[in-house]
Amino acid sequence: MILFKNLVFLPSILIGYISIRVSLLVWVNWVLVWSSCFQVAFIFSLWYFILSIYTFFYSKKIKQIISYEPSYFVFSYRAIDLCPERVLLYFFCIFNNVVFPML
């Protein structure tokens, strides 16, 4: 019964997770392209895509969702934003906007 309940909720959580990633990627690329930073937009897309795949398969939060712990569903969906990917993403944005132009 627990397995069935979790299999019902898992697709909606994964769809929400993927849609958050895609919407942010599209928005940031739109800003970068309109500011004529085509190379930065391409590098950002590639970097963000790799980080998303890494987070999806290796993040402890995602593993806990897939391990069928029903009481963890709501917390896991909220805790996705606390993944190490966010820290790397912020670092990458700072590097692109501050350090990269000075090189």
Swiss-Prot record:
GO cellular component: membrane
Up-regulation conditions: By the zinc-responsive transcription factor ZAP1 in response to zinc deficiency and by mild heat stress.
Ubl conjugation recorded as keyword: no
Location(s), subcellular: Membrane
Membrane-spanning ranges: 9-33, 40-57
Membrane topology: Multi-pass membrane protein
Keyword Methyltransferase attached: no
Keywords: Membrane, Transmembrane, Transmembrane helix
Chain's role: Identified in a screen for mutants with decreased levels of rDNA transcription.
Protein name as annotated: Regulator of rDNA transcription protein 1
Lineage of source species: Eukaryota, Fungi, Dikarya, Ascomycota, Saccharomycotina
